Amino acid sequence: MNTENGYITPADALSRLFQNGFFSRLDLFFARFISEVTGGAAPEVVLAAALVSKYTAAGHMCLNLASMAGEQLGLPDDGQTFLTCPSLGRWRDLIAQSPAVGMPGAVRPLILDGKDRLYLYRYWDYETKLARALIARVRTNEAFDTALLRDGLNRLFPPADDGECDWQRIAA
């Protein structure tokens, strides 16, 4: 974690990334929360907590550790790197050892699945419940009324006068 100004601690690096707008206040506080509830988590775990918070706020379901491993964190505009993410194997091992992290099925603030994806528990739970509901629907053999389906499609996508293929109708 060297910068042009010399060595900085991981906590200082997170603070600088917050000050420069890379992390939000929520990301920083969540990372600090994980550090506090674990009695001082490894800096790599605290970094992962801040990143999973950031990625979730940006609309992602999880943080893919493999895609972030070795990445340099900073803002492109300032040209400074404040932190480099650890290698995948080391990062995964440190995260898995943290008491704040559980495997799928556990109730912990963070969930690490078998594909190196780190989730906030709530989002892992949402994804799991949604997947189960979709699988259950696919497995039901309920008959559907094809005439009703055809009428609905005709109402939403009337036949084109030019004889062209209506790709929206086909997609629906």
Please describe what each predicted stretch is.
Residues 1-172:
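Helicase P-loop NTPase motor core of nucleic-acid translocases
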